[in-house]
Amino acid sequence: MAPAGSTRAKKGILERLDSGEVVVGDSGFLFTLEKRGFVKAGLWTPEAVVEHPSAVRQLHTEFLRAGADVLQTFTFSATEDNMASKWEAVNAAACDLAQEVAGGGGALVAGGICQTSLYKYHKDETRIKNIFRLQLEVFARKNVDFLIAEYFEHVEEAVWAVEVLREVGAPVAVTMCIGPEGDMHDVTPGECAVKLARAGADIIGVNCRFGPWTSLQTMKLMKEGLRDASLQAHLMVQCLGFHTPDCGKGGFVDLPEYPFGLEPRVATRWDIQKYAREAYNLGIRYIGGCCGFEPYHIRAIAEELAPERGFLPPASEKHGSWGSGLNMHTKPWIRARARREYWENLLPASGRPFCPSLSKPDA
């Protein structure tokens, strides 16, 4: 295996996936930057790329060092209807920041759009497509490597997004924020995948809203849907960094802990290594994270799949595999934890004796 810090030549996303390579994604910016004081919860808009570019640059850098092969532009909800006159400057600045950091590590830059707030109230295809098209024009001008339509809870709107993104000829990925029950109009995950593939998406999957194991259940259903329809597409998954087995159809946003009380649900790095391995075994080759993921979670994906990738990320220079760095500790009971079996089988306590293990969703 190559030493930590080795990088691959910059190949396109489809060239990598077509050859069977593992692509490690990055993570959601909103929750991490909200905790750091640069994003306002509720609005969840990315003015930070203009107001605090150093904070965004730093997080891109941390994800790259952790092993990310793709840096997404921080353009979630950066639409004209959400940001008025600021939308264009925000999208342009987001592209510049991602490209600046990616250039130092051979990573790809993906321009990202997401569902609109308009769709729930006015299913105006022309107007919604024009909203997407405005962002796309900036991404095309900035020459991003590929495009991602993410966080869609209605497949109809996701299809519209794919149709718009295909207009510039760049590879298109699309991820829905759905669980095994399907989208908000009761379209099953398998049917969603088929519709997206027929719309022309090159890469199909899920992101956000649900934790690792629920997301992988949904991906299995998407994969089966594509197989049954004799359609092919690359698969991707970017789940939450929280455990959410008690979610309803709407995902973690319906849990009473959302968004400020989710810390007891945070996945460990070892949970994420298991997630990465299960995703790989399912045939998924684009594996990343979303809200709740931190750079060390991305490092966990990169480390788990290092045998397949052929190298470790730079951040592994400061991390012993499966706790191996603990073998030099002065306390023998801590030295005894320097092994995979210990961490794989640990059931972490929350330290909250009067708190329930699960919650009841509010919706």
From Swiss-Prot:
Single GO biological process annotation from the record: S-methylmethionine metabolic process
Pathway: Amino-acid biosynthesis; L-methionine biosynthesis via de novo pathway; L-methionine from L-homocysteine (BhmT route): step 1/1
Keyword Zinc: yes
Keywords: Metal-binding, Methyltransferase, Phosphoprotein, Transferase, Zinc
InterPro entries in the record: Betaine-hCys_S-MeTrfase_BHMT (IPR017226), BHMT (IPR051524), HCY_dom (IPR003726), HCY_dom_sf (IPR036589)
Pfam families in the record: S-methyl_trans
Cofactor field: Zn(2+)
Keyword Methyltransferase in record: yes
SUPFAM superfamilies per record: Homocysteine S-methyltransferase (SSF82282)
Tissues expressing this chain: Expressed in fetal heart, lung, liver, kidney and eye.
Residues annotated as binding Zn(2+): 208, 290-291
Catalytic activity from the UniProt record: S-methyl-L-methionine + L-homocysteine = 2 L-methionine + H(+)
EC number: 2.1.1.10
GO molecular function, one term: zinc ion binding
Ranges for domain Hcy-binding: 11-305
Phosphoserine modification, residue list: 321
Cofactor note (record): Binds 1 zinc ion per subunit.
Subunit structure: Homotetramer.
Its biological purpose: Involved in the regulation of homocysteine metabolism. Converts homocysteine to methionine using S-methylmethionine (SMM) as a methyl donor.
Protein name, as recorded: S-methylmethionine--homocysteine S-methyltransferase BHMT2
Organism listed in the record: Mus musculus
Gene (UniProt): Bhmt2
